[in-house]
Amino acid sequence: MRFFIDTANVEEIKKANRMGFIAGVTTNPSLVAKEGRDFNEVIQEITSIVDGPISGEVVSLEADEMIAEGRVIAKIHPNMVVKIPMTGEGLAAVKVLTEEGIKTNVTLVFSATQALLAARAGATYVSPFLGRLDDIGDDGLVLIRDIADIFEIYGIPTEIISASVRHPIHVIECAKAGADIATVPFKVFEQMLKHPLTDSGIDKFLADWEAAKK
């Protein structure tokens, strides 16, 4: 399973990229707005840092407008992926963009049927949301497993991006469930990096080394 970072914060992206474990970036209008910067400026800076898929999301709701927006996003950089909401209009846009050779990421997926429809429309990626399903008492990991099973049975090339990842356990369970990618906030990566036994082990090694020098 590969890792994307879910943020529009350039400093977080730089830190994660320096550690060598991220293969791409996902953004959305909320994350970009949080940075208080121009969308194109942010995305162009991100593409200069990470050599991998960068998802930029449309803000229109009508297919024709999403297609026009998607074409603009795709022209920013060859690594751009157009992120489109899971609606009928969204799938119509996915079909056209796919036919034009533009990669798409269908977001806000909450059921296996939605994922299957998006895949058949030509989506490069589908993004089921774990945390938001957990919030309403559903099991997002069951959804990941169902989508992975269906895609495997029918040889569907669309990749699964586990989104709305809230904690390290989500990450492990996504990997076990068959997700191709987990897009993870920087704060969750920080939690994944740490373990109290690692810290105490380092402290002991250093203490032993200092004692040996005396």
Curated annotation (Swiss-Prot):
Keyword Magnesium attached: no
Family: Belongs to the transaldolase family. Type 3B subfamily.
Any GO CC annotation of this UniProt entry: cytoplasm
Provenance organism: Listeria monocytogenes serotype 4b (strain F2365)
Domain of life the protein comes from: Bacteria
Keyword field: Cytoplasm, Pentose shunt, Schiff base, Transferase
Pathway: Carbohydrate degradation; pentose phosphate pathway; D-glyceraldehyde 3-phosphate and beta-D-fructose 6-phosphate from D-ribose 5-phosphate and D-xylulose 5-phosphate (non-oxidative stage): step 2/3
Active-site residues, as the UniProt record annotates them: 83 (schiff-base intermediate with substrate)
Gene Ontology BP terms: carbohydrate metabolic process; pentose-phosphate shunt
EC numbers, comma separated: 2.2.1.2
Function: Transaldolase is important for the balance of metabolites in the pentose-phosphate pathway.
Protein name: Probable transaldolase 1
Keyword Transferase: yes
Subcellular location field: Cytoplasm
Catalytic reactions of this protein: D-sedoheptulose 7-phosphate + D-glyceraldehyde 3-phosphate = D-erythrose 4-phosphate + beta-D-fructose 6-phosphate
InterPro entries xrefs: Aldolase_TIM (IPR013785), TAL/FSA (IPR001585), Transaldolase_3B (IPR022999), Transaldolase_3B/F6P_aldolase (IPR004731), Transaldolase_AS (IPR018225), TSA/FSA_arc/bac (IPR033919)
